[in-house]
């Protein structure tokens, strides 16, 4: 064991832009980076309860050996692929959120990620993302290049539902190259058509703002996630400002052959985060950035017969940044007492993490955005 202390939509190439006119809002001088671990990362092998005999009984083949765990406490440690994060843990810039979930969880990929993106209740259906509502409550400055940038996916996720200036792109260079050749997606509504010229100008302006071309000393990992992190840092390097960036690391739906797949993905994640920190330190932005992971759900504690795990509930997530108060938050799932479908009870409502960002990072009233009071998780320094 290793121990360590209603929008107008335009698309071109692989990019999509949604713009809506709105008044200038409050200044968002702190950035949120969301990292989606798409498919449902297995939290139990991410933060390993290496002293719990139930863990090894439920996972005779998949359990991480005690000697391989990167120890964080006398009970829990990280998957060995996450060893690059040990320095962040020692620096108290890594918060580990345990048992994250919500009441009456849904185990469908599509429905559960919708719940996370909209911050809705399990039986509530909304079209507007939680960030869409946040920026409606307190708009970002019009001088910003955009409210948010989605990298590596055409799905706007928490920025969906209209009313945001959101840019979704797969490749910055392609986005810039094709910006002036944009063609409108057919939409209905005279009000939208009346803004065509304004939107076209906004597209070109946004492309120009994203053309940071900052020459980083940081070396970024190869692969799609490393490229996405590099693109995110280029977006943040532009002086015009952006409130949120989301990047996606996909492949976590590990019903079969989980061990190798998750090890590779967690290594990609850890290496990407280390590069992200290095680049943001170069930009003098690390102390003004918080990184938050999320996924549609976790995995069941009991391994299946295919060398994998099935859809589960309570999960582990990370918050990282220069102003993060590092440590363990929440409580580890009680895997000795599982529900009838083989899942543990959650400890932290995921909307508490959102409330932390809204109330304590941006100064936006979380009750208005989330439709109720959710206790913030104190992973940010005062």
Predicted regions and their residues:
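Metal-dependent active-site segment of extracytoplasmic phospho-/sulfohydrolases and closely related
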Residues: 279-305
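Feature for exported/extracytoplasmic and membrane-associated proteins, marking the mature portion
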Residues: 1-283, 302, 316-382
